[in-house]
Amino acid sequence: IKSSAASDVYKRQAQAVSEPAQETQAEPAQEAPALPAGDIEAYLVPLEGDEARPEGAGAILEKNYPQGSGEKYIPCGSGSIKNNTSVSNADVAAEITNPFPFAVEWNSPDPQILIMHTHATEDYRLSAGLWYRPGDGSRTTDRDLNMCAVGRVMADTLNAAGLNTLHDETLNDYPSYTGSYANSRAVVQQYLAQYPSIKVVLDVHRDAIETESGSRYAPVCTVDGRQAAQVMIICGCDNGTTVRLPGWRQNLRFAAAWERSMEEMYPGFTRPVLFSYRFYNQDLTTGSLLIEIGGHGNNLNEALRAGQLAANGLVEALRG
């Protein structure tokens, strides 16, 4: 297994970019915006126009995924949770009303949040139009174009709001996809050992949804007149045998709070939380979640906007 220590040639030194905290600033400011909306423009990239469309380009299908209804779905504020476990809906509904499992320190010199990427090389399309290049595998080692770019927006937004956040840019899935979760686990354990103040660990990915014919879906929504990718939180559950997550209830409370916050602030922004028998190294803290920012059908700018919106929602969730 490839070790993801600081000497890893594919790793950038993670840094907290917030200014040193004033000791008297113990509480967050109540006027909310974290990274002002206009500031996202500095992160956006030029997209290719239709004049660059190659022969045989694949099709993109935009879709807004609604909140779920039916026996598998549990209301969560304006959002919902899809229960793919044997835990009863009543138990889940009761659990998500319980108090937050941890408290972050605002404007602290000590890191509170870690953002990382098990599948860092996942990327997005770079076309403005609804097409993608033939043969595009939607992966790149260019950190300005892959999940690291989205993680930067999220980290900067959180730091600007007074939440000391570290962003690790290790390419845990390169050069080999096999073992990427073992690699990212070692990364997270290293951070937790060095910074025991960390309460939240976010593994930021993107989804991949496509038809049998190869058309790719782009989960989208409109916020303030601009298109952004939809997001989906994944929260694991302990099945007693192959998936051991003793703190799954605490993670679920956190997932529900973040889901409620995002969907209340930005209606239509979230897909239902997926509550399932997934491990994803979510045993390491009681604030460990995986979030999918759009999919391989979205363009990068939609994903960058979504990263800012998701982080804004997290700020409000952590304010309580």
Regions found by a protein language model. Give the residues of each.
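Single conserved hydrophobic/aromatic residue that forms the stacking wall/gate
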Residues: 1-6, 10-13
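Active-site-adjacent substrate-binding region
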Residues: 247-274
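Active-site-adjacent mobile loop/cap segments within catalytic or ligand-binding domains
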Residues: 268-320
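Solvent-exposed loop/turn segments at secondary-structure junctions
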Residues: 120-123, 171-175, 206-211, 238-241, ...
